[in-house]
Swiss-Prot record:
Probable Na(+)/H(+) antiporter. InterPro entries: Cation/H_exchanger_TM (IPR006153), KEA4/5/6-like (IPR045158), Na+/solute_symporter_sf (IPR038770). This is Transmembrane and coiled-coil domain-containing protein 3. It comes from Homo sapiens. Residues 1-22 form the signal peptide. Gene3D superfamilies: 1.20.1530.20. Belongs to the monovalent cation:proton antiporter 2 (CPA2) transporter (TC 2.A.37) family. It comes from the Eukaryota. It is found in: Membrane. Expressed in the cornea, lens capsule and choroid-retinal pigment epithelium (at protein level). Disulfide bonds: none annotated.
Length: 677
């Protein structure tokens, strides 16, 4: 302990010259002001000030070296002390090493400041690039210093905790404990071991990983009216990690995995967002039902009212959109559940040919208009591909319960439409896989275009191979697995419906995971899961649909509300004329192209359904939001084009129910019309 006391004396000793220097700071400042105003003998005072400063700095460095020697001596004495345990030796040595690091970092900070001042004086104040580079270097230095200081602070906290634990152990050794106290002491030690075992050193493990950047963030606590309550809640949130972080790019973050996993936590922002969406969706959907509009309109309006362009009350936007994706998964599963493989055999050629021809025609028209408007071919291809896709979840809602029995030699429009939408989902996965290569091709020199084309062809071949593997897997599952699996679920779920729901959900997630691993869209996996289950017969289909539909309905509400979060009424109002013209142009073009393609590939007896199918394909898919955001981050499209894509997509989705109802009224016989509207 004497060695420890002497060492802490030497810890405090180097700080004294800095305190003296702080007292003299006022005098130095006055001298600088006089020099600036031309008072006094400038040359003599300047030389004297430099000599004094150098003398003080040299003295501090000598004292620092002396302290380092004392610390080395203290470390050697601790290591030779036979009265200390190995753990206590490591602790004391580590404490001395922390202070050594502090002295070295303080010295480095002085010379870094001098170097920074020298660089600033040598630079040109009119050269913005040079000033930017200097600022970047200072920012990097500050980030590294902050990380080092944070690491040192955590080490000091650990040292303090060790001292407290050592004091507790000493007190327990000097007093007799009751049986209950001994049990609690054993529990405390077991809890400490548990925390050490489950704690992940994510910060230390990732701070040196390549590509990791250090950034300054703001930590925002929830406001409370009462200051005392605010302090108490801040202490609790600081412990529970429920505050919000905001970086310099205005991105907001919340806790995903706490350091201490033994304490249960809940994201109250996300809970409030879901509760708010659920409460506001009811009157919005009710109002749309009362005036004869589809309820999805009300859910989108709910998202608009709560989103950034409305009340801005949704804080966990990413989490809400993620939950909404499950609405897409379950919707497509139920679509596949009503999609008979026998019907698919009848229309598989139409389902494959139609979307491919439509996409090629859209890209051709896009390149033509892009050439006339002097738009880059990469942008033209991307925008055309985005606009060629149609919304599978939306059309699935239109088709719920509208499938009808085929007449002899006739084709059901719902089967054709669903088959084409599934093919478009495959195209979506293909395009998302090819898009990075397409971006590189647009940025590469003309000499490497052939290489990029070959790379795209290789990617297309990989996707086609993945599709073949998926369908082969589906054949195996249908023949050998799905029947025994469902029978086992049915036996175990008698009187316990949750086992059936959980088993079907697990099968959906398994299929979407398989398709995602094979670089095919997860949506296709959900659809195929439904189609495989439907192969067990109508009784099975009805039982599973009855169980899954309530889950689908709630998650679909969240999905359509999340679409409303990306609707910006003010932007639409500013550019209403342009947006309405673009939306009508896109909808009319898609409608006419679909009708043209279907008139060429449909049999004569089924030509009348081309208008209904064309109406179902005339809107733009909500997945253009995802494609647009990726393209904007990659620099393929500008911010203005991205907002135009969002607005045109949203307006086309709002126009889709009107066009669908008009097509059904015009082309479907009256007895079959009610279930389709």
């Amino acid at each position: 302990m004497k060695v420890l006391g002497r060492s802490f004396f030497w810890v405090l000793f180097p700080v004294l010259p800095w305190a003296v220097q702080a007292v003299e700071h006022e005098e130095v400042a006055q001298r600088v002001i006089k020099l600036h105003r031309g008072r006094g003998v400038a040359a003599m005072q300047s030389r004297q000030w430099v000599r004094d400063s150098c003398r003080k700095l040299s003295g501090l460095l000598r004292q620092k070296n002396a302290v380092l020697n004392k610390l080395k001596t203290a470390i050697g004495a601790v290591e030779k002390d036979v009265g200390l345990s190995d753990e206590e030796k490591l602790f004391q040595v580590h404490t001395f090493e922390i202070f050594q690091k502090e002295l070295n970092e303080s010295e480095n900070s002085v010379f870094q400041a001098v170097y920074g001042l020298q660089r600033a004086l040598q630079g040109d104040y009119k050269d913005v690039v040079n000033m930017k580079e200097s600022s970047r270097q200072r920012l990097e230095a500050l980030r590294e210093a902050a990380i080092k200081e944070e690491t040192e602070y955590m080490e000091l906290l650990a040292a303090e905790k060790h001292q407290v634990e050592a004091l507790k152990n000493m007190q327990h050794q000097n007093q007799s404990l009751s049986m209950l106290d001994e049990i609690l002491e054993d529990v405390r030690k077991a809890a400490d071991r548990l925390e050490e075992e489950i704690e992940e050193h994510a910060f230390d493990d990732n701070k040196s990983v390549k590509g990791v950047n250090f950034e300054a963030v703001l930590r925002v606590e929830e406001e409370e009216a009462n200051s005392k309550q605010n302090i108490t809640k801040r202490e609790v949130e600081d412990d529970l990690g429920l505050s919000m972080l905001i970086d310099s790019q205005n991105n907001q973050y919340i806790l995903t995995k706490p350091r201490d996993s033994t304490i249960p936590r809940a994201d109250h922002h996300f809970i409030k967002d879901i509760v708010t969406i659920g409460m506001l969706s009811l009157p919005c959907g009710w109002l749309c039902t009362a005036i004869g509009l589809p309820t999805m309109f009300g859910y989108i309006i709910c998202g608009v009212l709560l989103g950034p362009s409305g009340l801005n009350s949704i804080k966990s936007i990413v989490q809400v959109e993620t939950l909404g994706e499950f609405g897409v998964f379950f919707t497509l599963f139920l679509v596949g559940l009503e999609f008979s493989p026998e019907k698919l055999r009848k229309v598989w050629k139409i389902s494959l040919q139609g979307p491919c021809y439509m996409t090629l025609l859209m890209i051709a028209f896009g390149l033509l208009w892009g050439h006339l408007l002097r738009i880059k071919p990469t942008q033209s291809v991307f925008i055309s591909t985005c606009l060629s896709l149609s919304s599978t979840p939306l059309v699935s809602r239109f088709l719920m319960g509208s499938a009808r029995g085929d007449k002899e030699g006739d084709i059901d429009y719902s089967t054709v439409l669903l088959g084409m939408l599934v093919t478009q989902d495959v195209q979506l996965g293909l395009f998302m896989a090819v898009m990075p290569t397409l971006i590189q091709a647009g940025a590469s020199a003309s000499s490497s275009i052939v290489v990029e084309v070959l790379r795209i062809l290789v990617l297309i071949g990989q996707i086609l191979f993945s599709l073949a593997a998926v369908f082969l897997l589906c054949l195996v599952i249908k023949k050998y697995l799905i029947g025994p699996y469902y029978r086992k679920l049915h036996m175990e779920s008698k009187g316990n419906k949750e086992i059936l729901i959980l088993g079907i959900s697990a099968f959906i997630f398994l299929m979407l995971t398989v398709t995602e691993l094979l670089d095919v869209s997860m949506e296709l996996g959900c659809f195929l899961a439904g189609a495989l289950v439907s192969s067990q017969g109508p009784v099975v289909t009805e039982e599973i649909a009855t169980s899954i539909e309530p889950i689908r309905d709630f998650l679909a509400i969240v999905f359509f509300a999340s679409i409303g979060l990306h609707v910006f009424p003010t932007f639409v109002a500013y550019e209403l004329t342009v947006l309405v013209f673009l939306t009508l142009s896109v909808v009319v073009m898609k409608f006419l192209l679909a009708a043209l393609v279907l008139s060429l590939i449909l049999p004569r007896s089924s030509q009348y359904i081309k208008w209904i199918v064309s109406a179902g394909l005339a809107q733009v898919s909500e997945f253009s939001f995802v494609l647009g955001s990726r393209a904007r981050r990659a620099g393929v499209i500008s911010r203005e084009v991205y907002l135009l894509i969002l607005s045109v997509t949203t307006l086309s989705l709002l126009l889709a129910p009107v066009l669908w109802r008009a097509a059904i009224t015009r082309c479907v016989p009256r007895p079959e019309r009610r279930s389709s509207l």
